[in-house]
């Protein structure tokens, strides 16, 4: 009955599933199951096997290729299927027939003798033996125990011979392809080929023995006994495993004589460096491995140093010398007791160009950052910096310190970044000022934000206020009761100086700061006048500098409308000097005849514009501005008068002939009108003796004195006798002074004052009225004026 059931089950499964040949089962690799020509023979053998088929099948596995396929009974298959569902139920949703081999190197190659992926027959017979090629090797893999299975199950591989006509296997990497199966067959799809491409470059894999005796199997393998679930057909997902990261450590063969297929063998170069005496001189070696006389030589070098600068130079020289000696192996052969000490010169060592943070440090020529690291770590730890025990002791145990210096630091970016993170993330209550191990020469090579120079220039940052505002945010309880002294004493300054980070470029920075004050005042005078470009006229109120745009006009028109320039002037619209003289004569005659101020002012401004555009500053220019000032003064336009008298002042400063005295007096009177005492004082200071003798200037000075003293009687007497056109300017502020005079007279009136004396400050129509009002109070007759 069991044979019939097994025969029926084998007949049902033969049309759906493939089988695993003896080769793939021997190697322990999982291959897709396809229909085999030997299936009919195996089915007939299974029908004749009783319940002890497991024992007979194990005996038949060594007889030939017909009995190489092993099967289990129906009861055992169902029990294994239940066990699979119990332990590997997570992977059944992907129709994965076998347990997910995360930790088991499963092969994706098909074995010889089985049909290809697309049902094509293999070109190699199943009974043909294979001989692995030179770069390929295989070995016994020690698999961890599978849950629920016997721990003593063996996983062995048997050597087979390849035919002579086999094509060579291509290699996808620079080292040998690690074939975990008997090799891919030619008909296999490219997706089923696998190569160890994740191994690091430069690792050599030694040959393994292929004559290793096979161990007797203690039980059938899990992937041999387990069958796919019914209904899944030939579907199978090749889920890629996580890449196996091969480290640089060498896995030696175990004591049982089994060879590991993953263990990289050390290359000959590394072996020589480790074995010979020169191998001890490797740059990554510790100073503890140095010869004793070499250590004494380093101590003598640092003992001879007198200052920190000497130690810096000695440290740099020793690094270059000792690294070269350790590299060529002469450090263990020379007599260090007779080796001369490196010469120390007082000149500062030329600074090497700064290196970027992301540049890898050179092994033969260490950068300046390495030296700064040793000073930051070694010197401070020996000086007794508080709180420098954690990282300082850790580094002190790895390197031997000579004269407050670590002569060698291993240029390892990974270790330096780890040390920097560990130091910056420490929660010690005191602030450590220590450089990080990042080998860069920049000024910001401190560990995080922890290293700030302590002193008067950089006080500690203040908080927002309130309780604990003097503390740094994020510190522990041990610092809450402490306050930062704003004015440190002499003793505290010495302690702070010991905590300061030593900057290797301190002297260079001092020289740069001193160089800024060697050339006197840093402000330099502008060599050329600041010119406003025409294409960048953003401020509409500022006039362009016409000195850079001097042109010669060609316009013959005597009259021209005044238009404000918004672009470069056109010579065809500008009148030359000859035409401008005719235009000035026309404006004078027109003003005398018609007194049309609007026309006269427009034409005078147009003439001034043409003179400015052409850069003409001659006596004719002075005449134009004086004429326009007189017309504006006569009409009472003090704005235009102010513009004209300002230009006349600059023209007179160029020693151009004109009515200098007259317009100087007008300027003084204009300052009295605006009550600009500062400009009045300046103008009086620049008056010469000859200028003061001018009648107009003398009158203006007398009027200014009466106005300043509040002598209104004298002020109005001078106002009545104003020369030239000074009266037009006094008219602008005469009413203001009359009111002030009346207030003064009302406050200080005495009957002894005559009406005629008081009437002087009044205009002529009011003199009679005031005289009549004052007659009733005055005992004396009023004299006729």
From Swiss-Prot:
UniProt name for this protein: Leukocyte receptor cluster member 8 homolog
Modified residues (Phosphoserine): 352
Key word Phosphoprotein present: yes
Subunit field text: May be part of a SEM1-containing complex.
Phosphoprotein as UniProt keyword: yes
Basic and acidic residues composition-biased segments: 32-43
Annotated Low complexity bias: 47-64, 413-428
Signal peptide limits: none
Coiled-coil zones: none
Keywords: Acetylation, Phosphoprotein
Positions with biased composition (Polar residues): 13-26, 119-143, 175-198, 246-276
Domain PCI: 637-785
InterPro entries per UniProt: PCI_dom (IPR000717), SAC3/GANP/THP3 (IPR045107), SAC3/GANP/THP3_conserved (IPR005062)
Region (Disordered): 1-64, 119-292, 336-507
N-acetylalanine carried by residues: 2
PROSITE patterns named among the record's database cross-references: PCI (PS50250)
Source species: Mus musculus
